[in-house]
């Protein structure tokens, strides 16, 4: 709310100072991942640092996403949900904790995939993915549903695969 108020009052320098102060020390390596897309960089670097702090190996492959034709809000929903789920699954994993992430534009397509170690199979309820979270069971798989809705909005396709020790979510969206 404070940032919003500063921006509405056109207090841009104060907003930048405020954000800088509250985020100081939030993560050490601000630009470990650079896609040339500010929103994507912010999410990926934040989640990368979170994973590293939780002793999760985070392997990534990205390229220049500066010309991506997706709304920022949609990018946030997809990336935040996929990476939050991957980090949570790895945290609960016994043994190796690894996230492999790919987000690239190639051959007139957006390709995004997340593969992570896990300890359990996907739970389905009424042909939909159900959450394993103990918090608010009424929100079964809301994040995944939102991802699928956005993929369909852009006429894309997705694949979800799972076995006892790995989860894989892949998205292809035509440019």
Show where each model-derived region lies.
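Conserved short strand/loop->alpha-helix "switch" segment adjacent to the catalytic nucleotide/phosphoryl-transfer site
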Residues: 32, 58-79
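Short beta-to-alpha transition helix within the HATPase_c
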Residues: 17-24, 36-53
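Glycine-rich/acidic phosphate-handling loop/turn and adjacent ATP-lid/helix
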Residues: 110-141
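Conserved ATP-binding N-box helix of the HATPase_c
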Residues: 72-95
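Short beta-strand/loop element within the Bergerat-fold HATPase_c
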Residues: 96-108
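Glycine-rich nucleotide-binding loop
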Residues: 120, 163-170
């Amino acid at each position: 709310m404070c940032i919003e108020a500063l921006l509405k009052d056109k207090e841009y320098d104060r907003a930048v100072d405020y954000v800088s102060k509250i985020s100081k020390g939030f993560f050490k390596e601000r630009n470990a991942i650079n896609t040339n897309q500010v929103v994507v960089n912010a999410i990926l670097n934040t989640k990368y640092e979170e994973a590293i702090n939780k002793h999760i190996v985070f392997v990534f492959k990205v390229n220049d996403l500066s010309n991506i034709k997706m709304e920022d809000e949609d990018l946030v929903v997809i990336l935040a949900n996929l990476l939050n789920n991957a980090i949570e699954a790895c945290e609960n994993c016994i043994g190796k904790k690894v996230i492999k992430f790919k987000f690239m534009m190639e051959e007139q397509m957006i390709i995004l995939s997340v593969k992570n170690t896990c300890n359990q199979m996907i739970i389905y309820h009424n042909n939909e993915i159900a959450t394993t979270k103990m918090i608010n069971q009424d929100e079964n798989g809301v994040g995944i549903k939102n991802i699928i809705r956005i993929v369909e909005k852009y006429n894309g396709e997705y694949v979800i695969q799972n076995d006892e020790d790995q989860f894989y979510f892949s998205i292809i969206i035509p440019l």
